[in-house]
Amino acid sequence: MTRTALVVGDGGVVGHRLASYLAATGAWRVIGIGRRPQGPPGVTHLALDMLDRDALLGRPQAVAGVTHAFLTAKAPAADAAAEAELNARLLHNMIDMLEAGAAGLQHVALVHGTKWYGCHAGPYAVPAREDDPRGPAPLFYFDQHDALAARQRGRAWGWSTLRPHTVWGYSRGTGNNLVTLIGVYAALLREAGEKLAFPGTPQNYEKQSQATTADLLGQALAWAATAPSCRNQDLNLTNGATFRWRDLWPAVAAFFGMEPAGPAPEPLTQLMPRYEPLWPRIQRKYGLAEGHLEELVNWQYGQGLFSVAWDDGSSNDKARRLGFAAQEDNRTALLRILGALRRDHIVP
């Protein structure tokens, strides 16, 4: 039986990969929602604003036949409290639309992350487990999770949430993307004739880190949404093993034909404005895709990730126990995604 997926946020790193993966299987009809005019190939894309409840309820036919809904989008706001309120409203709007038009709804899935455990606020217990205490509030994960559980009570459909960490993948026009940032950063330093210094702090260079590829996350989202054992469950999902940037960085440098170096002396937001004028020249020199640098990278986002001084780690035991055994080798995955960026003329 063909399932029908609704992917809200099909233009983002996670949503784009999930929608593409589902469409490629041939077993799913995929409807994508986002603000961009187009979605991934094979996806019926709708340019809708998920915060406009009246407009959504005016189009119940848009989600007719949807059996599985995946919320991969996030609405940004000025502060954490406002962001929590906004994203809870986004979830309620999605469920209202589904209840109006998707009579056969079976499952609603959310993508959250290890901020659930407070990884952004300071040292936390590692490896983190799904039943560990919540980190500091406000955080929109908590508001969405509580709202989802409340909306599901007494309904035939179930839910799941996945908690990845630092998703590796890419989507055009998304600045909050670590692998694209690394690629652009390396291209700029190479054009300047410099070594590839690590773009973070000495502590971040040495600490235990983890990541989740968008490919792996897409597979896990589809699995959790269709496995009876995952009904109403929260699941950590990372590549598997942890890593240290000091061990991966030489491979990144080799990919770009550069000599690796240790941590840079300045944070990205101070360092990179001096190099940004080189980007148009790099685009012309290597025939890269057109577009402004700010559409590819957000130095503040990268600086935040590369400044964390404490260990990160999540236990994937629950997902494995319930049946998801796939994992990724961190070095192989990072180089594969950089290769895809090069293939698509995003970085040289």
Regions from the PLM with identified roles:
Residues Q38-G39, A47-N93:
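NAD(P)H-binding glycine-rich loop region in Rossmannoid oxidoreductase-like domains
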Residues L217-G302, S315-D317, R321, L338-H345:
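Mid/C-terminal beta-alpha module of Rossmann-like enzyme folds, strongest
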Residues A147-N176:
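Conserved beta-loop-beta element that borders a ligand/cofactor-binding pocket
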Residues N177-L181, G200-A225, N232-Q233:
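Substrate-positioning beta->alpha
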Residues R3-T25:
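N-terminal Rossmann NAD(P)H-binding glycine-rich loop of SDR-like oxidoreductase domains
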